[in-house]
């Protein structure tokens, strides 16, 4: 076995980083045999199997490595597992792991969970969390030492395994508790989490068995794995996961939009499709959550229904004068029908409207998102171009709701929320303070933002709870905080409050970066199926959450805030990424404008219909065409038009 280059690499890391990260690339081990669902034995040396590391210093703190295995034996070497291990030394309980899209600081909101619903990792003896390469949106794993301030990350070039025993077998990446530290591990197939070996996070509520993920090396076969080791020191100005995220952007450069439709075409088709959802009758008026062919005619505000979005977006986009009439009617209906449902105790209101006149529901996510659209519509109606709109009823509705929300939040006995769902209330409160001249709205917005900043800004903390169907860390929870911080940042800039500008700029950047780690920065490859049929490019799409492991187009909703942060931070990468996210997520849209929610880039089946989930990677579930998959495109296009920006 050739260990010379491995020894040189350890020295190269020290020279390249100039940092104090206590870690090392361990000598390679080869797994032989398979027993009880895992590698039977690890060996340091297999006669005839040469292992060599080729290294390149990329920049301070970053070394590129290509590990090369060559089998010189005369017969196949069977039931083999190849590996890479980078060990970060320290108390395992103080080493906080961050794997984008699946294990955010070990997913502390589900601490102690033992089933397969949400992966967890705290650093206890025997713990591991290892996942398929194709599952990872940003393909890296980082460990941050909460005591010393060091961090280490391993970035990978995701790849399938030649000679894998399982169909569509890929390499895997994860973390494993060790004596005196935690290992970042790359394996040629084996996966597992929550102390369960050889299982895949393949369903919303449970795991799926994934056994016998070994490989066979043929005589003369050469196999290589490319990875980058990044070491440094985290500070409150740049946590380790943020520095790793920035390197991931630089490595994969997810900015190419040449293959995608232009924004004008996208917005027009989405507008045309939105009109097919229009319903107008004695008890209901607006845009339905589901397609009319389903027979379900509910108008639902916020979250998956987005019933208030077109009231803002259609007049701004101004495709036809009839769009203004529909926008007026849709928001007037909300003002008339739902104003009486506003609860004086907390400002929440009913969000589901049925054709028979009944209304129900109401939660911070849906109410906050709806109020933000209504407030943007009120703002636009006050401009010269929006003079054709009468915002009287909208103003009455929004001011009453925001007054009740701010009253509740500003109470001394206000109950601090368990999740970031109430983060979606911040942006409309900020606009309310400006449009209605209500300082109490701004005070409530700052109180909410201050609470979220105190709870979630720091090592080992991850935003969660912005989604209504997952109880874990999720990108929607991070977006809830990011949207609110960014609104407060703009207000601080407008009012020339330098201290608050600095505070909210950092909070917004942190929440944005955590949200962006759910974003695909590389284009995966797929088995035969719908995604391969369309040469689907995954860059710009986003993983939902550690619990819901499919891609969706939700990132489109975040595009305006990302672009504005790119402008504020003078970071052209963010602007280009925002453009990619908008345009890439139009892929798979039918000629009618319909788009389904679930993109199966990895082993995951959200309906859990008991089919073979490992045969579904590369598939596309197009039946769930709820209105947000249309509304977010229109909302983002409208905001960008108001900003005078072409994506």
Where are these predicted regions, by residue range?
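Short, well-ordered helical secondary-structure segments
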Residues: 2, 86, 123, 130, ...
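Boundary at the C-terminal end of the N-terminal hydrophobic targeting segment
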Residues: 20-23
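Bacterial N-terminal signal peptides that target proteins for export
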Residues: 1-8
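Glycan-recognition and catalytic cores of secretory/periplasmic carbohydrate-active enzymes
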Residues: 235-647
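Carbohydrate-recognition beta-sandwich/jelly-roll modules
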Residues: 25-370, 374-395, 399-403
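Bacterial N-terminal signal peptides
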Residues: 8-17
């Amino acid at each position: 076995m050739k260990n010379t280059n491995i020894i040189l690499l350890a020295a190269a890391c020290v020279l390249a980083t100039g940092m104090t990260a206590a870690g090392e690339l361990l000598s390679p081990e080869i797994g032989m045999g398979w027993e009880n669902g895992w590698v039977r034995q690890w060996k340091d040396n297999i006669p005839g199997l040469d292992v060599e590391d080729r290294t390149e210093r990329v920049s301070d703190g970053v070394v590129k490595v290509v590990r090369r295995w060559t089998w010189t034996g005369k017969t196949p070497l069977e039931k083999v597992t190849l590996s890479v291990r980078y060990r970060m030394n320290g108390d395992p309980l103080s080493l906080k792991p961050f794997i984008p899209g699946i294990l955010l600081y070990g997913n502390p909101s589900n601490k102690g969970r033992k089933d397969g619903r949400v992966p967890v990792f705290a650093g206890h003896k025997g713990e591991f969390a290892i996942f398929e390469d194709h599952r990872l949106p940003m393909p890296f794993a980082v460990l941050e030492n909460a005591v010393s301030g060091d961090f280490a990350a391993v970035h990978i070039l995701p790849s399938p395994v030649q000679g894998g025993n399982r169909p569509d077998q890929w390499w895997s990446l994860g973390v494993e508790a060790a004596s005196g530290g935690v290992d970042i591990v790359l394996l040629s197939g084996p996966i597992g989490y929550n102390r369960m070996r050889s299982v895949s996070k393949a369903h919303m509520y449970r795991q799926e068995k994934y056994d016998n993920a070994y490989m066979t090396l043929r005589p003369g076969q050469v196999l290589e794995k490319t990875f980058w080791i990044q070491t440094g020191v985290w500070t409150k100005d740049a946590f380790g996961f943020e520095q790793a995220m920035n390197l991931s952007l630089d490595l994969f450069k997810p900015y190419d939009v040449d293959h995608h439709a232009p924004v004008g075409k996208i917005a027009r088709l989405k507008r045309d499709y939105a009109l097919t959802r229009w319903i107008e009758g004695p008890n209901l008026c607006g845009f339905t959550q589901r397609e009319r062919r389903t027979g379900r005619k509910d108008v639902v505000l916020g979250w998956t229904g987005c019933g208030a979005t077109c009231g803002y977006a259609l007049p701004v986009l101004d495709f036809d004068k009839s769009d203004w009439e529909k926008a007026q009617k849709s928001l007037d209906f909300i003002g008339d029908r739902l104003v009486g449902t506003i609860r004086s105790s907390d400002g929440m209101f009913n969000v589901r409207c049925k054709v028979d006149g009944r209304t129900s529901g109401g939660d911070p996510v849906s109410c906050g998102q709806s109020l933000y659209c209504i407030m943007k519509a009120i703002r636009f109606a006050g401009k010269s171009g929006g003079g054709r709109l009468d915002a009287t009823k909208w103003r009455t509705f929004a001011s009453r709701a925001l007054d009740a929300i701010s009253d509740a939040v500003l109470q001394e006995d206000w109950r601090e929320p368990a999740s970031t769902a109430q983060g979606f209330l911040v942006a409309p409160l900020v606009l309310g303070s400006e449009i209605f001249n209500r300082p109490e709205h701004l005070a409530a917005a700052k109180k909410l933002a201050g609470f979220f900043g105190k709870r979630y800004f720091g090592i080992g903390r991850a935003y969660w709870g912005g989604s209504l169907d997952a109880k874990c860390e999720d990108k929607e929870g991070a977006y809830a905080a990011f949207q609110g911080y960014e609104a407060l940042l703009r207000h601080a800039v407008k009012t020339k409050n330098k201290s608050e500008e600095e505070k909210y700029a950092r909070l917004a950047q942190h929440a944005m970066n955590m949200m962006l780690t759910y974003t695909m920065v590389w284009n995966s490859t797929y088995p035969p199926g719908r995604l391969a049929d369309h040469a689907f490019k995954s860059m710009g799409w986003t993983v939902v959450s550690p619990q819901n492991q499919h891609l969706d187009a939700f990132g489109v909703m975040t595009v305006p805030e990302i672009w504005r942060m790119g402008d504020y931070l003078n970071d052209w990468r963010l602007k280009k990424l925002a453009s990619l996210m908008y345009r890439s997520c139009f892929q798979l849209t039918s000629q009618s404008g319909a788009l389904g929610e679930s993109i199966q880039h990895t082993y995951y089946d959200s309906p859990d219909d008991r089919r073979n989930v490992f045969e579904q990677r590369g598939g596309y579930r197009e039946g769930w065409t709820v209105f947000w998959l249309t509304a977010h495109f229109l909302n983002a296009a409208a905001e960008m038009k108001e900003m005078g920006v072409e994506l």
